[in-house]
């Protein structure tokens, strides 16, 4: 591991992922220069300024440099697993049937409440390590398995500690409106009161949330209930995002757009109006093919409608114990292509530039541009398409986080 803050990566091919660049912004025979954890040059090697001649050099051997990958939707902090529910679904039970029978999210709540913060960190690190091993440099982590003030705070603190234990950027999201805890006896209005009057103020005061999320679905919370949470988030000046239209069309995409949400996620049942509303609001569509695959969904998100509307699309693992126990963004890209018919360029942009946009950090990372964080992944491949094409193969050569290998 090098601690040199000034490095030139030579003999490289660079996919900058710049916004308007064609073909992933690919530059052949390129060099990239890092100084003080920032990118200071990314371009043709034969135009490399002489001022960098004394910097440490790393010969990339014509390998491909991309931005470090970004997993923009995870529930990485959880306790235990739900393999038994996997077996139930194989026997024919639906996601909704499992949830209504007391399984699903509520079973994860029991496990998380019983775990200590240290337990959560210890159990989560192997999942995080699996992502890091594939070139991931930023991970979004949601709460939502505590569903009371102390447990939600515990989850968010555990998530923040992940960034202290590993060289990775962590973005935390408060997902109090994830499910109704059993002690509320079906009283959703009273629970939303707790979310906005008890949990959110404490979390905001401690600065533990970079965003606020909700689950807008018949088995979770209806649009008017989510709107109350979003109004409270806006009062605390915290951006919002939404689990929307996964199992039915409750017009969650349009709701998210009406609040200027960073993203709306899942979106299998979103219609053309929802796609257009998201495009107008700049709300990113975060597609989660792992969950689609794992629960054997048949309704695909409207990728063509998103393209037609100009809605930006990101991809994420949705790592969670019940519906997407997935810790591979490389496999997620392949699923985005094979299941949702996304292009190679859409898939790679979806785990770099558009994932950064979905987290509100595109000004810091997600592309290889001067002034941005030196978060890089260097791949031993001949074509960018290999990142999407291969299954069960990791061609990562080096991962660079804030300029450090």
Curated annotation (Swiss-Prot):
Known role: Catalyzes the hydrolytic cleavage of the carbon-nitrogen bond in imidazolone-5-propanoate to yield N-formimidoyl-L-glutamate. It is the third step in the universal histidine degradation pathway.
Protein family per UniProt: Belongs to the metallo-dependent hydrolases superfamily. HutI family.
Gene for this chain: hutI
Biochemical pathway: Amino-acid degradation; L-histidine degradation into L-glutamate; N-formimidoyl-L-glutamate from L-histidine: step 3/3
Tagged with keyword Electron transport: no
Broadest EC class assigned to this enzyme: hydrolase
Binding, Zn(2+): 73, 75, 243, 318
One GO CC term on file: cytoplasm
This enzyme's EC code(s): 3.5.2.7
Signal peptide extent: none
Subcellular location(s) of the protein: Cytoplasm
Source superkingdom: Bacteria
Keyword flag Coiled coil: no
Cross-referenced NCBIfam families: hutI
GO molecular function, one term: iron ion binding
Gene3D superfamilies per the UniProt record, alphabetical: Metal-dependent hydrolases, Urease, subunit C, domain 1
Keywords of this entry: Cytoplasm, Histidine metabolism, Hydrolase, Iron, Metal-binding, Zinc
Organism per entry: Brucella suis biovar 1 (strain 1330)
Name assigned to this protein: Imidazolonepropionase
UniProt catalytic activity: 4-imidazolone-5-propanoate + H2O = N-formimidoyl-L-glutamate
Binding site residues for Fe(3+): 73, 75, 243, 318
InterPro entries listed in its UniProt record: Amidohydro-rel, HutI, Metal-dep_hydrolase_composite, Metal_Hydrolase
Binding site for 4-imidazolone-5-propanoate: 82, 145, 178, 246, 323
Main location: cytoplasm
Cofactor note: Binds 1 zinc or iron ion per subunit.
Binding locations of N-formimidoyl-L-glutamate: 145, 320, 322
GO BP: any one term: L-histidine catabolic process to glutamate and formate
